[in-house]
Amino acid sequence: MSNSVRPAVKLTGIRKNFGLLEVLHGVSLTANQGEVISILGSSGSGKSTLLRCVNMLEVPNSGSVSIMGEEIALNHRSGHPSRPKYPKQVNRLRERAAMVFQSFHLWSHLTILQNVMEAPLHVQRRDRKECHAEAEALLERVGIASKRNAFPSELSGGQQQRAAIARALAMRPEVLLFDEPTSALDPELVGEVLRVMRNLAAEGRTMLIVTHEMDFARDVSSRSVFLHQGVIAEEGLSSEMFANPRTERFRQFLRRDGAASH
């Protein structure tokens, strides 16, 4: 299968338990290359768990995960936690599907420039000069080049999240995963992060985004997926879903979030 038609991410029959509680009930989702998919839902719907299953931060109890056509080999054993068969495969595929977290996860003892350089230099073992030049360019791109020598504690939340996006991009991933990237930000800082994400979407990046930003989901995402109680209750083109919700569950969700179509 050629790269032009190979899905970037394919989740099939994903089930995930935490103890006796099953939070995902056989969810299947395919993201094609260049698609921006927003994953929507109320708290506890399973949306962040689903995203974390993509790069094995949560290991599904059953089902399969493929990234760029390569399936992650898993050991599913009845009565036992599932685990990847080959940790090296997971580490390699995490470079292809980079995660941006709600809480930034920057190294507090490193400068912003060092944070962006860290993984390319020490995980991918790329040339230091190359890593430095690319990190500088990425910080310029997300609008915080002047903060290159600052430490995370010296930055606003929005600046820290933009640094986290630059750090993810430094791995040269084929897929970007965003887990509620604006939820921890003060309202006045949300826009600067969403602008960076809009620019990435305009470049044709493959992005899976768990978000409560309904305007962003409607205007930027090519498709949206609405999770309710661990299953996909509605999915489709974002423009169509927001203009004409097919299910009462999604209509209620939009009304509650103040995101009625316009």
From Swiss-Prot:
Its main location: membrane. It comes from the Bacteria. Pfam families: ABC_tran (PF00005). Gene3D superfamilies: P-loop containing nucleotide triphosphate hydrolases. PROSITE patterns: ABC_TRANSPORTER_1 (PS00211), ABC_TRANSPORTER_2 (PS50893). Keywords: ATP-binding, Cell inner membrane, Cell membrane, Membrane, Nucleotide-binding, Transport. It is a peripheral membrane protein. Residues 9-254 form the ABC transporter domain. GO terms for cellular component: plasma membrane. It is found in: Cell inner membrane. The keyword Transport applies. Component of the octopine active transport system probably consisting of four subunits: Q, M, P and T. Belongs to the ABC transporter superfamily. This is Octopine permease ATP-binding protein P. It comes from Rhizobium meliloti. The gene is occP.
